[in-house]
Amino acid sequence: MASGHAQNDNIVLEVEDLKKFFPIRKGRLGRSSAVVRAVDGVSFTMKEGEFLGVVGESGSGKTTLGLTVLMAHAPTSGSIVLHLPNESYDLAKLSSAELRPLRKEMQMIFQDPFSSLNPRMTILDIVAEPLVLNG
Protein backbone atom coordinates (compact mmCIF):
# COMPACT_ATOMS: atom_id res chain seq x y z
CA MET A 1 0.00 0.00 0.00
CA ALA A 2 1.61 3.21 -1.13
CA SER A 3 1.50 6.40 0.89
CA GLY A 4 0.91 9.90 -0.39
CA HIS A 5 4.48 11.04 0.30
CA ALA A 6 6.36 12.30 -2.73
CA GLN A 7 10.00 11.37 -3.16
CA ASN A 8 12.35 14.34 -3.30
CA ASP A 9 16.07 14.92 -2.92
CA ASN A 10 16.66 11.14 -3.10
CA ILE A 11 15.17 10.59 0.35
CA VAL A 12 14.90 6.86 1.01
CA LEU A 13 13.68 6.82 4.62
CA GLU A 14 11.71 9.26 6.75
CA VAL A 15 11.08 8.47 10.41
CA GLU A 16 8.85 10.90 12.23
CA ASP A 17 8.04 11.05 15.96
CA LEU A 18 8.70 7.32 16.37
CA LYS A 19 7.78 5.85 19.75
CA LYS A 20 8.09 2.33 21.13
CA PHE A 21 6.86 1.73 24.67
CA PHE A 22 6.90 -1.59 26.50
CA PRO A 23 4.41 -2.27 29.31
CA ILE A 24 5.73 -3.14 32.76
CA ARG A 25 3.75 -6.06 34.16
CA LYS A 26 2.58 -5.64 37.73
CA GLY A 27 0.40 -7.63 40.04
CA ARG A 28 -1.03 -11.12 39.86
CA LEU A 29 -3.32 -10.44 36.95
CA GLY A 30 -0.49 -9.07 34.83
CA ARG A 31 -2.12 -5.67 34.58
CA SER A 32 0.15 -2.92 33.40
CA SER A 33 -0.01 0.63 34.61
CA ALA A 34 3.48 1.79 33.63
CA VAL A 35 5.63 1.64 30.51
CA VAL A 36 9.29 1.72 29.56
CA ARG A 37 9.80 4.41 26.92
CA ALA A 38 12.51 2.64 24.92
CA VAL A 39 12.15 4.98 21.92
CA ASP A 40 10.39 8.29 22.50
CA GLY A 41 9.90 10.84 19.72
CA VAL A 42 12.75 9.96 17.34
CA SER A 43 12.74 11.65 13.91
CA PHE A 44 15.30 11.53 11.10
CA THR A 45 15.58 11.49 7.31
CA MET A 46 18.05 9.45 5.27
CA LYS A 47 19.01 10.15 1.69
CA GLU A 48 20.31 7.67 -0.85
CA GLY A 49 23.90 6.66 -0.07
CA GLU A 50 23.79 7.81 3.55
CA PHE A 51 24.48 5.66 6.58
CA LEU A 52 23.11 6.23 10.05
CA GLY A 53 25.14 5.39 13.13
CA VAL A 54 23.30 5.23 16.44
CA VAL A 55 25.55 5.56 19.47
CA GLY A 56 24.62 5.43 23.13
CA GLU A 57 24.97 3.68 26.43
CA SER A 58 23.78 0.15 27.02
CA GLY A 59 20.02 0.16 27.45
CA SER A 60 19.52 3.52 25.74
CA GLY A 61 17.23 2.14 23.01
CA LYS A 62 19.63 1.78 20.05
CA THR A 63 18.63 -1.77 19.17
CA THR A 64 14.96 -1.10 19.85
CA LEU A 65 15.12 1.87 17.47
CA GLY A 66 16.63 -0.28 14.72
CA LEU A 67 14.21 -3.15 15.24
CA THR A 68 11.25 -0.77 15.27
CA VAL A 69 12.34 0.97 12.06
CA LEU A 70 12.68 -2.48 10.46
CA MET A 71 9.23 -3.35 11.85
CA ALA A 72 10.50 -6.30 13.90
CA HIS A 73 8.75 -4.42 16.73
CA ALA A 74 5.48 -2.64 15.99
CA PRO A 75 5.82 1.04 16.88
CA THR A 76 3.63 2.52 19.59
CA SER A 77 3.17 5.54 17.32
CA GLY A 78 4.89 7.52 14.59
CA SER A 79 5.57 6.97 10.92
CA ILE A 80 8.30 5.08 9.06
CA VAL A 81 8.15 5.94 5.35
CA LEU A 82 10.31 3.94 2.94
CA HIS A 83 10.74 5.59 -0.47
CA LEU A 84 11.47 3.21 -3.33
CA PRO A 85 11.96 4.34 -6.95
CA ASN A 86 8.28 4.00 -7.91
CA GLU A 87 6.37 4.04 -4.62
CA SER A 88 6.52 5.10 -0.99
CA TYR A 89 5.27 3.01 1.91
CA ASP A 90 4.41 3.89 5.51
CA LEU A 91 5.75 0.69 7.04
CA ALA A 92 3.86 1.22 10.29
CA LYS A 93 0.57 0.86 8.39
CA LEU A 94 1.41 -2.32 6.47
CA SER A 95 0.46 -5.89 7.34
CA SER A 96 3.09 -8.62 7.77
CA ALA A 97 2.29 -9.93 4.29
CA GLU A 98 2.71 -6.45 2.77
CA LEU A 99 6.02 -5.96 4.61
CA ARG A 100 7.56 -9.26 3.48
CA PRO A 101 8.69 -8.16 -0.04
CA LEU A 102 9.99 -4.82 1.31
CA ARG A 103 12.31 -6.40 3.90
CA LYS A 104 14.99 -7.08 1.26
CA GLU A 105 15.34 -3.30 0.88
CA MET A 106 16.23 -2.78 4.58
CA GLN A 107 19.01 -3.93 6.89
CA MET A 108 20.53 -3.22 10.26
CA ILE A 109 24.20 -3.91 10.93
CA PHE A 110 25.33 -4.55 14.49
CA GLN A 111 28.89 -3.63 15.30
CA ASP A 112 30.95 -5.08 18.11
CA PRO A 113 33.26 -2.24 19.18
CA PHE A 114 35.76 -4.62 20.77
CA SER A 115 36.38 -6.44 17.50
CA SER A 116 36.14 -3.37 15.27
CA LEU A 117 38.49 -0.95 17.04
CA ASN A 118 42.14 -1.43 16.19
CA PRO A 119 44.32 -0.61 19.22
CA ARG A 120 47.18 0.31 16.87
CA MET A 121 45.17 3.13 15.25
CA THR A 122 44.39 6.56 16.65
CA ILE A 123 40.76 7.68 17.02
CA LEU A 124 41.36 10.10 14.13
CA ASP A 125 42.55 7.22 11.91
CA ILE A 126 39.56 5.06 12.87
CA VAL A 127 37.03 7.82 12.15
CA ALA A 128 38.78 8.93 8.94
CA GLU A 129 39.22 5.45 7.45
CA PRO A 130 35.66 4.96 6.05
CA LEU A 131 35.58 8.56 4.83
CA VAL A 132 38.82 8.09 2.91
CA LEU A 133 37.71 4.72 1.50
CA ASN A 134 34.36 6.11 0.32
CA GLY A 135 35.76 9.28 -1.17
Language-model segments: which ranges?
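ABC transporter nucleotide-binding domains
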Residues: 1-135
